[in-house]
Amino acid sequence: DGVFIFDVHSTYKTDTVFPGYSYHENAEEFAMVWDSYADDAPHSVVHELTFFLQDEDGRFTRYDEVHEERTYEVLTYDILLEQAGFKSFKLYADFEDKKPRKKSERWFFVCQK
């Protein structure tokens, strides 16, 4: 018996918000570039991040990261949770105690074993 809580990006976010997303920040001691692209698999995205961090001697060191993310339809999570032995779950969205809407960006699952 127990509760399992997790969150994922919604399909709306992976399919509509992230593709073409770009964020850049420039401060005195660091700079950051974040670009996102749709990936080949359904509801998947690639984030390319580049950081420039200032060292003690004043020079900047570059760090690159690639993050690949994928989400699924709620029905897929439902099936997988049932296969894992969970009896029920409640679904919330966007850090609120509300059901997801069409343009919700993050889903929160509260699952009962």
Sequence positions of predicted segments:
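Glycine-centered, small-residue-biased loops immediately flanking beta-strands
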Residues: G2
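C-terminal lobe and adjacent flexible extensions of AdoMet/dcAdoMet transferase-like proteins
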Residues: E68-K113
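SAM-dependent methyltransferase
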Residues: I5, H9-T76
